[in-house]
Amino acid sequence: MPFIPHTETDIQDMLAAIGVNDIEQLFDEIPSALRTGPLNLVPEAMSEMEITRLMHRRAAQDHVDLNFIGAGAYEHHIPAAVWQIATRGEFYSAYTPYQAEASQGTLQLVYEYQTMMTGLTGMDVSNASLYDGASALAEAVLMSVRANRKSKSHRVLMPATVNPVYRSVTRAIVHGQGIELVEVPFDPATGRVDPKSLAAFEGQDITALVIPQPNFFGVLEEADALTDWAHAQDAQVIGVVNPVSLALLKPPGEWGGKGADIVCGEGQPLGAPLSSGGPYFGFMCCRKEHVRQMPGRIVGRTLDADGRTGFVLTLQAREQHIRRSKATSNICTNQGLVVTAATIHMALLGPEGLERVAAACHANTHALIERLKPLGVTPAFAGEAFHEIAFRLPRPVRPVLDAMAQQGVLGGYALGDDYSDLGDLLLVCATETKTEADLDRYAEVMKAALA
């Protein structure tokens, strides 16, 4: 729709109504030193037709590279129906509605989403979503401190194998709240936390242990052993998981003897495209006994006065719009539109379809390993992987990535950017979107880049 600005008459009428002579008077209180000068670099106004031509010219400059980067954001096939349905007028909102019970369709969809997520994770309860995977982990840490009444230390063990961005965001959010994040090193041979390395913490007051599955290197952690160790210390277990991997892997609710206490992660692989970093959504599930400490909105099913099934926002006393000073979190909305897409995505795939996607991801990753072995490019860690793997290169990573990019292949993520001692390691992801020809192309371009 074309933008129709105010006329000069409109502007003068509005200024007269508020008792000022010109627009500049509205900004008198801002010191001149802080004001922005004339925007000389802004081009002259263009007509709608001229803007359309400009956008077509710029769009023609774009090209799509073959992408093998993962590191927390993954390229999956999204059925066309997902966003066609999600962007219908009935759904097209980022929020759960303010008059929630008047929007039964939206509430039912969120309820179905929560049901699907508890099924995937093996947990009892899911919320309606959080902002993203990183903030979901931070909220899980805060939640564990509230929920673990046996612990007074507020010490949370955070493995170095957790996504570096997640660790950074968590540090920022819990800063100043009396919570100590203790980094746990990983075994350089396996690329995962060795349960024996936790012996130094035995007998100490530990609030929670974070377990990424798979971890940032793509390696599967020994979740059962780590979970049992944490519970033996009266610590809670926070699982950080990839939802697609749960179609193949043991759900966190079944880890060890008792299962995880809180599960969170990034929901982007469930129907959200790679779009300059967002919008994504975070998910969180927990055991029923911890539900009153869970942040975010929760949709429940009930009966109305006439005995008909209905859906409501339940346990709202946890939320900041009810009792801000006692709320479990200051999150005041959620990623409802992306959750809508995720729900449709999971419904279209079904359990068998999601399992096929996960199996194809795993198969492609191992097929890529075989193609790279003759080049002297081998897995850096002995641990089993899901759909992402760290390779050790015979040459520095950054020049290799630059050379591959020039050939239209995004070769992976340089782990040296976040781990100074892993400068020769390249993190590569091959999802179900990669064909045999794509894998061959990757190996061909990698060979040329190493030459």
Curated annotation (Swiss-Prot):
Enzyme class, first EC level, given as a word:
oxidoreductase
Keyword Oxidoreductase present in the record's keywords: the answer is: yes
Under the heading InterPro entries, the entry gives: GcvPA, GDC-P_N, GDC_P, PyrdxlP-dep_Trfase, PyrdxlP-dep_Trfase_major, PyrdxlP-dep_Trfase_small
Q: Name any Gene Ontology BP term.
A: glycine decarboxylation via glycine cleavage system
Task: Give the protein family.
Answer: Belongs to the GcvP family. N-terminal subunit subfamily.
Q: Recite the lineage of the species.
A: Bacteria, Pseudomonadati, Pseudomonadota, Gammaproteobacteria, Chromatiales
Membrane-spanning residues where? Answer: none
Q: Which reaction does it catalyse?
A: N(6)-[(R)-lipoyl]-L-lysyl-[glycine-cleavage complex H protein] + glycine + H(+) = N(6)-[(R)-S(8)-aminomethyldihydrolipoyl]-L-lysyl-[glycine-cleavage complex H protein] + CO2
Subunit structure comment from the entry: The glycine cleavage system is composed of four proteins: P, T, L and H. In this organism, the P 'protein' is a heterodimer of two subunits.
> What protein name applies here?
Probable glycine dehydrogenase (decarboxylating) subunit 1
Entry keywords, A to Z: Oxidoreductase
Q: What does this protein do?
A: The glycine cleavage system catalyzes the degradation of glycine. The P protein binds the alpha-amino group of glycine through its pyridoxal phosphate cofactor; CO(2) is released and the remaining methylamine moiety is then transferred to the lipoamide cofactor of the H protein.
- A Gene Ontology MF term for this entry? glycine dehydrogenase (decarboxylating) activity
E.C. no: 1.4.4.2
